From Swiss-Prot:
TM spans (from-to): 14-34
Localization, UniProt: Cell inner membrane
Name of the protein this chain belongs to: Potassium-transporting ATPase KdpC subunit
Gene encoding the protein: kdpC
Keywords: ATP-binding, Cell inner membrane, Cell membrane, Ion transport, Membrane, Nucleotide-binding, Potassium, Potassium transport, Transmembrane, Transmembrane helix, Transport
Keyword Nucleotide-binding on entry: yes
Source organism: Cereibacter sphaeroides (strain ATCC 17023 / DSM 158 / JCM 6121 / CCUG 31486 / LMG 2827 / NBRC 12203 / NCIMB 8253 / ATH 2.4.1.) (Rhodobacter sphaeroides)
HAMAP family, sorted: KdpC (MF_00276)
Amino acid sequence: MMTHLRPALASLLALSLLTGVAYPLALTGIAAVIAPDRAAGSLILREGQVVGSALIGQGFDGPGYLHPRPSASDWNAAGTFASNLGPTSAALLAEVQERQAAYEARNGASAPVDAVTASGSGLDPHVSPANARAQAARIARARGLDEAAVRRLIEAHVEPPLLGLWGQARVDVLAVNLALDAAGA
């Protein structure tokens, strides 16, 4: 039995060190050289302070800010998850209807799908252009800005599909909110 156990344990230890330590460290080192900002989490800095990440969404609920998609994890990056409610769930339907009513009351516009449904991770940093445009009037009122100026700012932050082919156009919520704050209104 020992003749089989010793090589098996040695293989387990060697592969554990290789795949659990050496490989992740090598990839982290390569990433730090090739793309240091991405290896560090794509952090966004303002005046030397981290204000967010380009990859992880965060909640904004003030009337003068662009609101993100709903988050099942309450914007907790340590515990990302979806609601796990099935498409035929009465609880999910009630949740979506509640979000829809709140969105339409806040914005005076019909709610796009991404405004009432959480993403799979619960931390999506983007909304659809339709969602962002529907919020423009509320943002302009709250900040005392011309609605056309807010719409121009939103349009300036629309990101096209990757290579024009994959995915959908999207708007980075944090980028728009930082631009709104920088505009001084």
